[in-house]
Amino acid sequence: MSTAIYYSTHNNMHTNDDITNGSGSTTSGNPGANPSNPNHTNAGATINNNSNIGLNSANKNHTTLLPSLAHIMPSNSNNTTNSGSSIDISSTLINPYSSGAAAAAAAVGGGNGGYYHPPPPHSQQQQQQQFDTSYSNQTTPTSAYTNFNNDSTHSPTDISMQQNMNNLASSSGNMSIGGGIDGNFSHNNNNNNNNNNNNNNKCICKSKVNKIPRPRNAFILFRQKYHQMVLDEGTVIRTNPEVSRELGRRWRGLSPQEKEHWNNLAEEEKKNHAKKYPGYRYTPRRNGRNKNCPVCKNKPLPNNKSNSISGMSGSGGGGGSISGASSLSGGLTSRDNSITNANAIDYQQQQLQQQQQQQQQQAIQFQSLPPDQYQQLIKQQQQQLQLQAQLNGGGGGGGITSNPQTIPQYITNGNYPSYIISPNPYSTTSTTAPTTTTTTTTNASSIGLSVPPTATTTSTSSQPTSANSQLHFYEAEKLSPVSSTHHQSSISEIAAQQQQQQQQQQFMYNTNYSTIPPNNTTTMQQHSAGTGNDYSLNGNNSGNTGYDNRYGYGQPMIITGQSQQGLQVQQQGQHYNSGLHAAQHYQQQQQQHHQQQPPQ
């Protein structure tokens, strides 16, 4: 659609213009024509409506009188309503749904006899597009501002500015009306909510209309009699608590005859109250709370009312208490005494089941750990058990020894064959002989040779570890029958053999018949990690019989990349499995050695 609009920049009124509406869109004007001729055809508009769709009529010419508001409104005198005009004030500048649409249409639409015809809704978008196109054409350089056929005295810039202001005014008016309604509505809602909250938060305990007052006693009657008198004295007493304090001091200073007078008045008051309210019974509020009052029902209970559960506060007497029971009893309190003892016992059982499940999970995790970490975790568990025993153990031996349920299941579930729980469960203990766990000890301080710490081992059955001795996991009679019978005899025999070995070692190393070079001993001491071959010092690998092969009964195995603790376990298992047989073999070797020595 091609639309061209021509405005005049002068103040002259031009009429009697010839306009040809067709495909050519040509106009001609006579500036010097008679201005008194009021008849003109489509003044100030040249329109080609052949391409418009959805309009009522095309190429329609209206002949109307010039309205009196021509100098006020920036529009043409002929308002071509629904005719595809590029400047349609009634359809584009005025919102048909606003409150002032009818008045504006009556003022503008002079060509239609003062009637306003709102456009259909489906044509508003097309008309808005036409208005945008006409506005862009007004601002383009192709628009020639010449003296052609325009009755308006305003420039195109003024017209566009005023049109934009009208649009903003109409839209802002609607927005202000809606905003005011919404704002008032929200304000009213807020006020209603605040009023409801205030009503809900009011205490209704003292505002009961039908509540029967209590009969007054002697002091209340005395205070009501002299309350105003104390205020009238003009002293520093001003408040009700001060008045009550002063009257209480005076009440205590009354004579018995005067108190008898007030007591008689109180008795009479009570009789009259009983006659007036025959079924009255004083019912105080329980625990200082009123269930019907929205404020008082949420008040906390006094400290003396919050009783703990009596069934959970066991002291461990008689040795039957569980370690976690006393710890649970401290945190379980009943605010309104709704939890019963049965519920508390159920809760305790649930807690115990959870603890057992956690212990089973820990046992599975511990079994997959290496020996070093396993030993550390065992020590930590034992320390925790000892602390719990000290905290929870009461009278009658309520410690760990009397509470078998506190022992973790990974200790007592029978994963290990013996009653003795060694620090390292991966150590191999042989059960071929009754005294296999009992080994000999050599006093390295009395000998000139430095022996590694793994060589000095103790009897695990007679000298248990500190953790085992504290937990008392075993007793002497609980061991195997053979070991329990030979327990004392084996210890005495080993002590005698140790003394004999020490005497022989002192004699041997003090003489010059030792075949061990001293340099090898120092190099062995300086070695940081050890070689695993510490006990075969004199050609034991080559098959020669040296004097120190008493430590290695059998060929030792060298394992590299092993920890010191692993070496200790291995050496204990390899070098001391024979028990007393190793000591007997050593005695035979010593006898052969003394026979081969030359006389001194």
From Swiss-Prot:
Q: Which InterPro entries match?
A: HMG_box_dom, HMG_box_dom_sf, SRY-related_HMG-box_TF-like
> Where is composition skewed (Low complexity) in this entry?
20-39, 47-59, 188-200, 297-312, 427-470, 497-506, 564-574, 581-600
**What GO CC annotations are associated with the protein?**
nucleus
Q: Which residue stretches does the UniProt record annotate as biased composition, category Basic residues?
A: 272-289
Alphabetized UniProt keyword annotations? DNA-binding, Nucleus, Repressor, Transcription, Transcription regulation, Virulence
Chief localisation class? nucleus
Q: Where is the composition biased (Gly residues)?
A: 313-322
One protein family per Pfam: HMG_box
The induction field says: Expression is regulated by WOR1.
Q: What happens when the gene is disrupted?
A: Leads to constitutive hyphal growth and avirulence in a mouse model.
Q: Which Gene3D superfamilies does the annotation name?
A: High mobility group box domain
MF terms in GO: DNA-binding transcription activator activity; DNA-binding transcription activator activity, RNA polymerase II-specific; DNA-binding transcription factor activity; double-stranded DNA binding; RNA polymerase II cis-regulatory region sequence-specific DNA binding
PROSITE patterns, sorted = HMG_BOX_2
Location in the cell:
Nucleus
User: Where's DNA bound on this chain?
Assistant: 212-281
Mark out the compositionally biased spans (Polar residues).
Answer: 1-14, 131-160, 481-496, 507-547
UniProt record, GO biological process: cell differentiation; cellular response to starvation; filamentous growth; filamentous growth of a population of unicellular organisms; filamentous growth of a population of unicellular organisms in response to biotic stimulus; filamentous growth of a population of unicellular organisms in response to starvation; negative regulation of DNA-templated transcription; negative regulation of filamentous growth of a population of unicellular organisms
Region entry Disordered, spans: 1-59, 112-160, 180-200, 266-337, 427-549, 564-600
Q: What does this protein do?
A: Transcription regulator that functions in both the positive and negative regulation of filamentous growth, depending upon the environmental conditions. Recruits the TUP1/SSN6 general repression complex to achieve repression. Regulates genes encoding cell wall components that are specifically expressed in the filamentous forms such as HWP1, RBT1, HYR1, ECE1, ALS1, RBT4 and RBT5.
Protein name, please? Repressor of filamentous growth 1
UniProt organism field:
Candida albicans (strain SC5314 / ATCC MYA-2876)
